């Protein structure tokens, strides 16, 4: 019955009776009586009673009993047994007791409502919406009218903000409406002498969070380029349209029921990760699915609708495809640099590789010959642009160590340094 509760509370599912523990078909001796017993147990142990269907299937003369449990609309569906009243959810292939946060979600779903559409205790008159007005004017060309707060679902007729309105307000009263941003030193959170190269914390309106989060990424991401016949090709470390989409989705679809949580932007040498509290709304794990075919599900539909009106996101819900497609369009993209997604019942993370990163061994060897040749070209481009550029600045632009740049220059017969010290200059032979 715990599995029945879990299926009804999640996406529905099937239970098959007549299969042994080692997955051998053994059948049931009295399938009709077993069906009556199972039906009775469901009706007496589950509250409310979920919609289910019992059928039989014969395989090699063995009768199997199949219980199909449908996704419920009157959640939570509680299991009553062992002196307890508990709700269960599906986590992968297992049925697990619903956490307090998951129970809150089930209650909201059973009421056909969402966190962002619920009324708050905050009065409209106590808060300003200059960020909303400014963005709305910029995107639509129209002025934002006070009555639009109600029509957008941000306020009630009697002058109170909804939770979506509280999140949009300039000085959001929702304390966990915030993002933590860190540029880590290395490939993990223990980078050596200095753990972090840059960090920032932002709170307030979700509109400000988007702007500040993107600004943090931009100031910690380098732009490389190479000359072409008539111009030059830019090669960013991270694709702006991809990380914009990931950040907007993280803020719009995060689980605001999880108190004391926040969106995280973590930049490492080789990747950018954007983490948001709360897993997939349907309880599945994104890494076990094809992200391009996942149907759009809005955990916070009011907030998502406002973001659409402000030009931050589209109604059709193509976020995963946008992140992947915009990466694939880059000239420095390879299959190894494809973004990927990871989730569990508590979190969702988008991982976007650094398109210009080349792995090193002991700081002296770059990963591939092609990578070395790319760096040689980029170094010569920088020298042609500024023949007095320092090796230190080259290293910063390339995102590699000073030692690596010096080695690459030493091994490149086409590069020569004329003169000594600061008075000297680079020359391409």
Regions found by a protein language model. Name each.
Residues 1-69, 73-75:
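Polybasic/polar functional segments that serve as interface/processing modules
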Residues 49-124, 258-261, 310, 317-321, ...:
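Intrinsically disordered, low-complexity regulatory tails
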Residues 90-261, 265-270, 275, 279-296, ...:
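Active-site helix-to-loop segments that bind/position phosphate- or nucleotide-bearing substrates
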Residues 175-177, 187, 284-286, 292-370:
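Flexible, glycine-/charge-rich segments associated with ATP-binding catalytic modules
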Residues 265, 422-429:
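Minor-groove-contacting beta-hairpin "wing" of winged helix-turn-helix DNA-binding domains
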Residues 396:
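Alpha-helical residues within the helix-turn-helix
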Residues 403-406:
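Key DNA-contact positions within bacterial/archaeal DNA-binding proteins
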Residues 409:
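DNA major-groove recognition helix of helix-turn-helix
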């Amino acid at each position: 019955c715990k599995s029945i509760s879990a299926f009804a509370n999640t996406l529905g599912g099937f239970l098959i009776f007549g299969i042994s523990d080692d997955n051998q078909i053994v059948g049931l001796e009295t399938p009709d009586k077993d069906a009556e017993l199972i039906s009775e147990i469901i009706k007496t142990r589950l509250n409310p009673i979920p919609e289910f269907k019992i059928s039989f299937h014969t395989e090699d003369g063995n009768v199997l009993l199949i219980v199909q449990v449908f996704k419920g609309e009157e959640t939570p569906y509680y299991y009553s047994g062992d002196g307890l009243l508990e709700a269960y959810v599906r986590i992968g292939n297992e049925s697990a007791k619903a956490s307090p946060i998951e129970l809150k979600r089930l209650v909201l779903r059973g009421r056909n409502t969402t966190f962002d559409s619920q009324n708050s205790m905050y009065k409209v008159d106590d808060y300003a919406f200059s960020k909303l007005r400014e963005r709305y004017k910029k995107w639509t060309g129209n002025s934002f009218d006070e009555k639009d707060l109600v029509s957008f679902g941000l306020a009630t007729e009697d002058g109170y903000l909804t939770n979506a309105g509280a999140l949009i307000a300039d000085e959001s009263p929702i304390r966990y409406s915030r993002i933590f941003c860190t540029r880590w030193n290395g490939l993990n959170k223990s980078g050596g002498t200095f753990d972090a190269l840059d960090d920032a914390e932002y709170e307030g309106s979700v509109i400000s969070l988007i702007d500040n989060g993107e600004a943090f990424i931009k100031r910690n991401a380098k732009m490389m380029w190479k000359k072409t016949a008539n111009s030059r090709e830019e090669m960013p470390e991270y694709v702006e349209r991809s990380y914009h989409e990931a950040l907007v989705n993280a803020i719009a679809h995060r689980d605001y029921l999880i108190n004391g949580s926040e969106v995280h932007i973590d930049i490492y040498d080789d990747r950018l990760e954007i983490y948001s509290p709360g897993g997939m709304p349907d309880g599945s794990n994104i890494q076990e699915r094809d992200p391009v075919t996942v149907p759009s599900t809005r955990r916070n539909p009011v907030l998502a609708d406002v973001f659409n009106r402000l030009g931050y996101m589209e109604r059709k819900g193509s976020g995963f495809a946008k992140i992947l497609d915009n990466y694939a369009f880059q000239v420095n993209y390879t299959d190894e640099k494809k973004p990927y997604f990871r989730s569990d019942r508590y979190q969702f993370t988008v991982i976007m590789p650094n398109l210009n990163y080349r792995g090193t061994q002991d700081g002296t060897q770059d990963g591939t010959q092609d990578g070395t040749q790319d760096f040689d070209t980029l170094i010569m481009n920088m020298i042609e642009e500024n023949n007095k550029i320092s090796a230190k600045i080259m290293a910063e632009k390339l995102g590699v160590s000073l030692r690596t740049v010096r080695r690459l220059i030493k091994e490149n017969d086409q590069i020569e340094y004329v003169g000594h010290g600061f008075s000297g200059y680079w020359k391409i032979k």
